[in-house]
Amino acid sequence: MNGAYAASFLPVILVPLAGVVFPALAMGLLFNYIESDA
């Protein structure tokens, strides 16, 4: 696995990660903050 292949393969992992995991994590943290504050 050379550098060019790794660079072309990386967005396939990063796009779902940034589109699904980060918003879900942000929603979870926001929910916990709201619930603990109330």
Curated annotation (Swiss-Prot):
Keywords: Membrane, Photosynthesis, Photosystem I, Thylakoid, Transmembrane, Transmembrane helix. It comes from the Bacteria. The chain crosses the membrane at residues 9-29. SUPFAM superfamilies: Subunit VIII of photosystem I reaction centre, PsaI. It is found in: Cellular thylakoid membrane. InterPro entries: PSI_PsaI, PSI_PsaI_sf. May help in the organization of the PsaL subunit. This is Photosystem I reaction center subunit VIII. It comes from Picosynechococcus sp. (strain ATCC 27264 / PCC 7002 / PR-6) (Agmenellum quadruplicatum).
